[in-house]
A protein has these predicted regions:
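Polybasic/polar functional segments that serve as interface/processing modules
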Residues: 1-51, 55-104, 111-113, 240
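Active-site helix-to-loop segments that bind/position phosphate- or nucleotide-bearing substrates
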Residues: 129-331, 336-338, 342-347, 371, ...
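Glycine-rich/acidic phosphate-handling loop/turn and adjacent ATP-lid/helix
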Residues: 327-372, 415-431, 499-505
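A short, conserved structural fragment
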Residues: 394, 472-482, 551-562
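Short acidic, hydrophobic short linear motifs in intrinsically disordered regions
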Residues: 444-456, 524-535
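Short, cationic-aromatic polyanion-contact patches
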Residues: 482-514, 559-583
């Protein structure tokens, strides 16, 4: 880790007043704290992180230092290698910071096939942790089981269901399924009778139905697994039931039957409860639902198809919850395999927890349609994001916490009138459409990081990084979390000012002009950009932007032509500002 990265991380910790999901600081003057094992396990099981030894959180992250950094490095490396299973290999180093030695370790996330990381001394169940916000939480036995299942290909959907026979199948679904198989996969299925074809497709295991076969083509799977269903609840308030009049819900549906029927019933319930919006199209008007149906269909299918079907989860249903400000779809079991929150939406990214179920549903259509339930091409979430973009809505927020996965759809137009007026009040010229979308997301109180920005705008990571960096340089955004774990918030003087009115938000306070601040910092001396950042506390990108402005105006000059050189220094010219000349 570079010194500048460490300084930025510590500045963020001090600004936040506490640790966060990707950074843990501990006072460790002479020995490793006992809780280090938990933190190392948590980082390795989540998204990786940075451990800083020698910072005292109780004293505002004061650099108290480490007395013998070489020994501390060796002790930490030995603990990672000998006390944790599998052994961890973090990047460990010492930095001199504010007169104290800090030992810094960068812990990478383990690949799915190696999780969970746990403390050997207490065993896998008691010694496995996960990072939640700024703390380390012990994994539940169910979460440990899911991580172990991710080490290979789960086979829960292939298991035979005791007491079932071919008579428990929906024969209309079976006829359509076999017809498609014989048409699309004639070499494998054309010459097989019904029983043989169902066995080859793994709908039948011997004389019993597989779990996948029962769920996809069964007449009533809930006869054997009552909770393998979908529930839909429409709540009257943002927090759920309305305590003022005792209304618990506006609508409540239990969707049962095979997966095609559950998807169909869920969409019927959603249509019944969604508001319609009128939009102008050409010379006429069109009625649209408040959420695009394509996005909802993909989300419901994903939840039913990619959920955990291990025995431990058979008592948990897929939940769809509608609130006035959002729609939440949640399923048991987090993301599987190589899929991560950061690559959701990347075309072709796919890992199938329930491979047999997916294969069957490729040739199982929705009721009254020729469209298959799923394509099994990793295209579901990209289609979901595209539908939300086309509808000018904010992208869904995805959350993976190992034991469950959820998609939350905000109920507002991304570039509504209030957001457009606020962005215009910033008086920033040359913003791209995607930058305006990113600002609008923060205006609506949503989380903004590189992934969310890409999802909202269909950009690659490089372009997203450049555009977010430009917003930082303009003084509109403030990065937090360090480079690797960066997320963004609105700068204080760019945020909409609070207002007592329930109408439009007041325009932001006028953002500071940094020219005088930088000129004062220069004085009669020369300084590098890094020197000026240290003196003023401005972000490096913001400093770069204002130095460019001052150079263009002739108020400063550079000592070298190559402004990219870290050695270039700046000094004031004889030209004076309007304030200084009294103009």
């Amino acid at each position: 880790m570079l010194y500048d990265d460490l300084a930025e991380i510590i500045a963020n910790l001090r600004g936040l007043g506490g640790d966060h999901a990707f950074v843990e600081a501990k006072r460790a003057e002479s020995k490793l704290p006992k809780s280090v094992r938990e933190t190392l396990s948590a980082f390795a099981n989540t998204s990786g992180g940075v451990l800083i030894l020698g910072l005292d959180e109780t004293q505002g992250f004061e650099a108290t230092g480490v007395r013998d950094p070489a020994k501390m490095e060796a002790d930490l490396a030995a603990l990672c290698s000998e006390n944790l299973e599998p052994p961890l290999r973090p990047l460990i180093g010492t930095h001199r910071f504010e007169g104290a030695d800090l030992v810094v370790a960068e812990i990478p996330e383990l690949p799915p096939g190696s999780k969970p990381s746990f403390n050997r001394g207490v065993g896998m169940t008691q010694g496995s942790f996960v990072r939640v916000a700024d703390g380390d939480r012990r994994l539940s036995p169910y979460e440990v089981q899911l991580m172990m299942a991710n080490r290979g290909q789960p086979r829960d959907d292939e298991q035979p269901v005791a007491g079932t026979t071919i008579a428990n199948l929906d024969h209309a679904l079976v006829d359509t399924f076999l017809s498609r198989l014989r048409r699309h996969r004639s070499r494998a299925f054309a010459n097989l009778d019904t029983t043989a074809a169902l066995r080859r497709a793994k709908v039948l295991v011997g004389t019993e139905l597989s779990l996948a076969g029962l769920l996809a083509l069964g007449e009533y799977p809930q006869e054997f697994f009552p909770q393998l269903m979908l529930t839909f609840v429409h709540y009257p308030t943002k927090s759920g039931p309305d305590p003022r009049n005792g209304t618990r819900f506006i609508d409540n549906v239990a969707a049962e039957g095979p997966i095609p029927v559950m998807v169909d019933e869920a969409l019927i319930a959603l249509r019944r409860n969604m508001k319609r919006r009128s939009t102008v199209r050409g010379a006429g008007r069109a009625e649209t639902y408040e959420y695009p149906e394509t996005a909802l269909r993909e989300a419901v299918v994903n939840a039913l198809v990619h959920r955990d079907y291990s025995g431990t989860s058979h008592g948990t249903q897929v939940q769809v919850e509608m609130y006035p400000d959002r729609l939440l779809i949640r399923n048991p079991g987090g993301l599987y395999g190589s899929v991560r929150e950061e690559n959701l939406g990347v075309e072709g990214t796919s890992s199938a927890r329930n491979a047999t179920l997916l294969k069957i549903l490729e040739d199982t259509p929705l009721p009254g349609s020729d469209r298959p339930i799923c394509e099994n091409r990793g295209s579901g979430i990209p289609a979901m994001l595209a539908a939300m973009r086309d509808a000018k809505l904010s992208p869904p927020r995805f959350a993976d916490d190992i034991s469950a996965f959820s998609a939350t759809f905000p109920n507002h137009t991304l570039m509504g009138d209030d957001a457009v007026r606020w962005i215009a009040s910033l008086d920033e010229h040359g913003l791209t459409d995607s930058q305006c979308h990113g600002l609008a997301m923060l205006f609506h109180g949503e989380t903004l990081n590189n992934q969310a920005y890409r999802n909202a705008n269909d950009l690659d990571s490089r372009v997203a990084t450049e555009e977010l960096g430009d917003l930082v340089a303009r003084g509109l955004l403030v990065p937090a979390g360090g480079r690797r774990y960066a997320h963004y918030t609105l700068a204080e003087d760019a945020a909409p000012a609070p207002t007592d009115s329930t109408d439009s938000p007041a325009p932001p306070k006028r953002r500071a002009d940094r020219r005088e601040e930088i000129l004062d910092a220069l004085g009669d001396d020369e300084a590098t950009r890094a020197d000026l950042v240290a003196v003023t506390g401005l972000h490096d990108r913001t400093m770069t932007r204002w130095l460019t402005v001052l150079l263009r105006q002739g108020l400063i000059e550079a000592t070298e032509r190559n402004l990219r050189s870290p050695n270039v220094r700046y000094r004031r010219t004889s030209k004076r500002t309007l304030d200084e000349t009294g103009g």
